[in-house]
């Protein structure tokens, strides 16, 4: 790496860059980022002001009233307010030679009782060059250290990393993301959302940046909306019922959509007062193992194709590194105490009962299924035709290995495995590999196998190799 990785070196490099000058506004865990710049010397060349409005009344007087303080909206208002104030006060005398910036964070660190969720929003709004339009990077972190002091230290380091990245790596966003955990580890900080915006990042696709977070191990899962806007998982899933479908989605077929639509309707009906249809968060999940090609690399063009077709279906997209369903279930439970359900085809359900997948677990398949179904999680099982024989697999007819038949029967009996009832029989013959093969070979039959909106976007943007032959 031809750049500094140590925090003090980065802070000093920024202090010695006379062309950058700005403000620090930090709430919730001390002035941990500004402190680095004071500590290494030369801060007068960088810091116009550092402020911490700890009192809520004082904070509201500066940034406007709010109900919640550790949220994205508060961070963005802090960045907007402080940057405009800096420009108003300092632009007339040094605007021609100075690129101004504002760093801000709003954080909930470990409390005195020590039982709260520790997380925060961190951001920088900056000019790359004097008189430039602003660019911005914001991120959400979970702080995993058990001691308050260690959390403060980690926050200071990631803040310096973000500022160094914004000033010196803005033209290499991949490297910028990778550098955020210099001198930190994923045991200390998880970054579950990052968003680039503004003039310098007009060509950055935030969906790819979300993918990078998971790819680099900075978070186990990242989300974006149908329109491609990055989402912070707890703000989406918090206290909501969740329905999730996992798939390859290359492309998303009529079967995929019938699965989630019919399961959603049934979820709302079966859930009674506990599950309102409008309240359900529908998520289409792609795992990293489904994204990696044969060589273990992720094809970005293929990834964007999948994101584009999922976008027109109006579902939230999640990229995760959870191969095992029981780990996925634990992740959802981190954010919501409402009912959660996964919908899958009968073929995928059979794999869940394959004991080979659980060889690493001390308690084997029993432990895995115990973890999966605890806390009121259910699986909706969509019927699937055997491509060889044409036999229809359902909850009732699925053949699982002899050793686990009683276990399977128990889960059916207890209502953990629920058959999807009102399915569309006309889509059962659609096989995803066949759709892709027809699409790439120029056989127009593929169009009837996907939703009209999906077909339109594939043809318009020539996704998945359409029109190549």
Model-derived features with residue positions:
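Nucleotidyltransferase catalytic core that binds NTPs
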Residues: 1-469
């Amino acid at each position: 790496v031809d750049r500094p990785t140590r925090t003090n070196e980065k802070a000093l490099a920024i202090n010695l860059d006379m062309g950058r000058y700005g403000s620090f506004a930090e709430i919730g865990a001390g002035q941990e980022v500004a402190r680095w710049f004071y500590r290494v010397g030369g801060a007068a060349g960088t810091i116009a002001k550092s402020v911490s409005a700890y009192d809520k009344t004082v904070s509201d007087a500066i940034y406007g009233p709010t109900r919640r303080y550790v949220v994205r909206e508060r961070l963005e208002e802090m960045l907007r307010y402080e940057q405009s104030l800096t420009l108003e006060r300092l632009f007339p005398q040094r605007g021609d030679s100075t690129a101004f910036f504002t760093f801000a964070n709003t954080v909930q660190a470990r409390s005195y009782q020590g039982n709260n969720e520790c997380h925060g929003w961190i951001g920088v709004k900056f000019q790359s060059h004097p008189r430039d339009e602003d660019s911005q990077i914001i991120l959400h972190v979970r702080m995993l250290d058990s001691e308050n002091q260690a959390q403060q230290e980690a926050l200071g380091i990631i803040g310096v990393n973000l500022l160094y990245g914004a000033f010196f790596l803005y033209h290499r966003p991949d490297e910028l993301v990778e550098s955020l955990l210099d001198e930190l580890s994923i045991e200390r900080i998880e970054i579950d959302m990052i968003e680039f915006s503004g003039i310098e990042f007009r060509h950055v696709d935030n969906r790819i940046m979300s993918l990078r977070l998971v790819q680099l191990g900075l978070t186990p899962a990242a989300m974006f909306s149908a329109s491609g806007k990055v989402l912070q998982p707890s703000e989406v899933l918090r206290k909501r019922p969740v329905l999730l479908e996992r798939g390859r989605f290359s492309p998303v077929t009529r079967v995929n959509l019938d699965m989630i639509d019919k399961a959603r309707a049934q979820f709302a009906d079966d859930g009674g007062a506990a599950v309102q249809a409008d309240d359900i968060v529908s998520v289409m999940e792609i795992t990293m193992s489904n994204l990696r090609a044969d060589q273990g690399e992720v094809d970005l063009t293929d990834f964007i194709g999948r994101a584009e077709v999922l976008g027109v279906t109006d579902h939230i997209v999640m990229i995760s590194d959870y191969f095992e369903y029981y780990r996925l279930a634990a992740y959802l439970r981190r954010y919501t105490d409402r009912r959660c359900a996964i919908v899958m085809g009968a073929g995928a359900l059979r794999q869940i009962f394959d004991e080979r997948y659980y060889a690493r677990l001390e308690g084997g398949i029993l432990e895995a299924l115990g973890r999966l179904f605890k806390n009121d999680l259910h699986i909706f099982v969509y019927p699937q035709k055997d491509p060889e024989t044409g036999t229809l697999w359902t909850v009732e007819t699925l053949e699982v290995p002899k050793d686990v038949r009683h276990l399977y029967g128990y889960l059916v009996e207890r209502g953990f495995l629920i058959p999807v009832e009102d399915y569309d029989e006309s889509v059962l013959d659609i096989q995803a590999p066949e759709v892709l093969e027809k699409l790439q070979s120029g056989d127009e039959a593929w169009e009837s196998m996907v939703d009209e909106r999906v077909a339109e976007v594939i043809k318009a943007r020539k996704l998945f190799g359409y029109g190549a032959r």
